[in-house]
């Protein structure tokens, strides 16, 4: 009796959804699992891409009838542009739909060792991540579903031999000979050459497992870092401290950024990731921003790396606080627990006072002279994302008197004193140190 060793064990008490095209790979897997009395729901797809596709349906449906298997059929109308990727997504959706209907998370496909080799070579030609270079995995999880590839370490030749031994019916898809697709070029030109010259196919599982072991170790370090440093009480939401990140090995840094993107379903090129890492490690550019998609930006500032949504217009983002002024501190105590006293000479301050946001040419006054507000904020290492959200207290002549947590004008004299308090005041940080 000829048998095939599966890459993963299956539970006879569970139900499995299996995609069957009618080709030798999926028909051999179907035969193998029927022989093991595995509970199956068979799904067949018609991509409407070639004539006589109805023969595939008839073959699979007939086999299901002979073996008392449930048969599910879908026609997929995929656009010609990026056909293979679009078809793969549609198949995945339909398989998950059937799995949900039959209350099982398990979905089987007949990918084999030659497919794994093709995928690895294809990834190398296009560049990928460490996980990507490992090709396909025996088991992957997506949402609530578990995708299994029992034939992943079985060579195509062994599958063909198995099908011939048991006289399993199957049909060849002539589009697999279409050299328009890079995968078919690799399948029919590159891999046959490598098979004759080296032990290429036998070494593929070792190569894949070595990469997966390295990936799993790196990802474990990534998760340890994020668990320790993300959403710490001293950090803004969706952020982590810059300093410990810079102490990590570059490969861990890259994986942290990759994981942040994966969690938001964002796909970026190797070069894009490299540019992010280069920017984060550049000490001469403390404030940087990378546009990831319409929903997310990655922000570097003096102390943090933050994943955030693009800021809405300021008129919507900030609510202007109410400035309360009094010569009596007790009168303001009920408005805000944080009062700021301001000493001044009447001739140096023009009332009324008002509150506004920072403007490009703002200047601060000190006992030693003046300084541009922009330079002052850079020296104070105020993150770029926070600078435009600063509320300034100015007099009627637009002289800056006070910036909460940052600055108090001490050049105004000391003949009189007033107290300032904000109602409905919001600032994105309470960690600034005030300069006198």
UniProtKB/Swiss-Prot annotation:
Keywords: ATP-binding, Cytoplasm, Ligase, Nucleotide-binding, tRNA processing. The keyword Disulfide bond does not apply. It is found in: Cytoplasm. It catalyses: cytidine(34) in tRNA(Ile2) + L-lysine + ATP = lysidine(34) in tRNA(Ile2) + AMP + diphosphate + H(+). ATP binds at residues 21-26. It holds the Pfam family ATP_bind_3. It comes from the Bacteria. Its main location: cytoplasm. GO terms for biological process: tRNA modification. It is an enzyme of class 6 (ligase). The keyword ATP-binding applies. InterPro entries: Lysidine-tRNA-synth_C, Rossmann-like_a/b/a_fold, TilS/TtcA_N, tRNA_Ile_lys_synt, tRNA_Ile_lys_synt_N. Its EC number is 6.3.4.19. GO terms for cellular component: cytoplasm. GO terms for molecular function: ATP binding; tRNA(Ile)-lysidine synthase activity. SMART domains: TilS_C. Gene3D superfamilies: HUPs. Ligates lysine onto the cytidine present at position 34 of the AUA codon-specific tRNA(Ile) that contains the anticodon CAU, in an ATP-dependent manner. Cytidine is converted to lysidine, thus changing the amino acid specificity of the tRNA from methionine to isoleucine. NCBIfam families: lysidine_TilS_C, lysidine_TilS_N. Belongs to the tRNA(Ile)-lysidine synthase family. The N-terminal region contains the highly conserved SGGXDS motif, predicted to be a P-loop motif involved in ATP binding. This is tRNA(Ile)-lysidine synthase. It comes from Onion yellows phytoplasma (strain OY-M). The gene is tilS.
């Amino acid at each position: 009796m000829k048998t095939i060793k599966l890459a993963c064990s299956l539970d006879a008490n569970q139900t499995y959804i299996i995609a069957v095209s009618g080709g030798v790979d999926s028909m051999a897997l179907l035969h193998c699992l029927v022989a093991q009395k595995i509970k199956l729901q068979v799904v067949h797809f018609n991509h409407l891409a070639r004539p006589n596709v109805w023969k595939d349906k008839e073959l699979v449906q007939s086999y299901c009838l002979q073996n008392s298997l449930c048969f599910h059929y879908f026609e997929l109308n995929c656009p010609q542009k990026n056909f293979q990727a679009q078809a793969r997504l549609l198949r995945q959706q339909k398989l998950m739909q059937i799995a949900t209907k039959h209350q099982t998370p398990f979905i089987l496909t007949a990918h084999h060792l030659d497919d794994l080799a093709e995928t690895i070579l294809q990834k190398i030609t296009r560049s990928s991540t460490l996980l990507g270079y490992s090709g396909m995995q025996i088991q992957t999880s997506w949402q609530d579903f578990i995708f299994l590839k029992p034939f992943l370490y079985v060579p195509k030749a062994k599958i063909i031999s198995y099908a011939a031994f048991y006289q399993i019916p199957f049909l060849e898809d002539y589009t697999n000979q279409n050299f328009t697709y890079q995968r078919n070029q690799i399948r029919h030109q590159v891999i046959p050459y490598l098979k004759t010259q080296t032990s290429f196919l036998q070494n593929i599982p070792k190569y894949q497992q070595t990469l997966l072991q390295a990936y799993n170790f790196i990802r474990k370090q990534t998760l340890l870092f994020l668990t320790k440093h993300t959403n710490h009480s001293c950090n803004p939401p969706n952020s982590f401290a810059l300093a410990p990140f810079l102490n990590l090995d570059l490969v861990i840094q890259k994986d942290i950024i990759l994981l942040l993107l994966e969690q938001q379903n964002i796909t970026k090129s190797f070069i894009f990731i490299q540019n992010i890492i280069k920017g984060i490690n550049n000490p001469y550019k403390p404030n940087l921003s990378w546009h990831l998609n319409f929903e997310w930006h990655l922000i570097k500032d003096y102390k943090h790396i933050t994943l955030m949504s693009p800021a809405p217009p300021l008129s919507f983002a900030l609510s202007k606080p109410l400035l309360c002024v009094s010569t009596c501190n007790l009168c303001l105590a009920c408005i805000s627990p944080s009062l700021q006293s301001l000493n001044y000479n009447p001739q140096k301050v023009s009332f009324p006072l008002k509150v506004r946001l920072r403007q490009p040419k703002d200047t601060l006054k000190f006992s030693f002279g003046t300084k541009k507000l922009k330079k002052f904020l850079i020296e104070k290492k105020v993150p770029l994302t926070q600078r435009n959200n600063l509320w300034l207290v100015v007099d009627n002549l637009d002289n800056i008197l006070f910036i909460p947590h940052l600055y108090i004008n001490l050049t105004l004299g000391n003949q009189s004193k007033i107290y300032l308090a904000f109602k409905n005041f919001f600032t994105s940080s309470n960690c600034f140190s005030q300069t006198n």
